[in-house]
Amino acid sequence: AAHSAASAAPAPAVWRLRPPPADPARLPQKLSVTAFKAYLDCPFRFYLARVLGMEPADDGAREIDPAGFGTLAHEALATLAAVPELADEAQLAARLLAELDRRVQTRFGARPPFAVVVQLDSLRQRLAAAARVHAESVRAGWRIVAVEEPFAVAFHGLQLVGRIDRIDRHADGRLRILDYKTADGGQRPLETHYQPRLKKWIDLQLPLYRHVHEQLHPDAGPVAVGYFNLPKAVAETAIAEMDFAAKSGEDLYAAALARAREVVAAIQAGVFWPPAEKRADRDVFALLFGADPPLIEEPRAP
């Protein structure tokens, strides 16, 4: 009997975290264009990170994280604006690599950790390939007219803020906005933004860049948007523009802006629940969500 009583004893209670409900005073008044992806990915993790300011613990890794890797690439690539007419691949590559070396020396000193050295070798290969693609672009009539252009534009009660990596103008007057991407695999803009079978937006970055440019330069005419991909497989380095014409005939640009308005309305209304399911190895908040049941509960007023 004693044994059965022991076996029937309840499991020890697990302490669970219940974050405070959204305080209207803490809701963001400004949103970066890239923040929309975070909300679409998981409203509740957006709330933890961008409203409550929670951050995952630093594991002390001695390597460059993806954001830092991208920053180094951006800093080097920004120097192309100083020589808009230059179309010599070797000279362009030398310029990019010299700027990278200067930044690395400042950030890591003369002896970077071995993991960083390996990453920098990959980045050098990507920048050399970028020089080739950029040279082709110049020969085709494109010129850089702006890099790292900051913006702040009103959008349905909030401010959209951010920086546009690069704006090009063609000899015939066409404009395009390019976002540098250093993900290992080359990215197709429409695939990274929209899932047609589900009619689901998973990112709004490029449509919002187009909207921002139209607001800031209403007389400039239509502007294309796309990625300048710098993938690990350097042979696939390329510029990829986003096509807003859906097979159904729908104008995906208008649909993207409508979804962006919905996101802003949800944030302003304090809608951050429920959390999305994510793989633990891709979740910076895995400690909170990885348990069964999760260690986190829906925010509610006391």
PLM segments and residue spans:
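RecB-family 4Fe-4S metal-dependent nuclease core
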Residues: 1-302
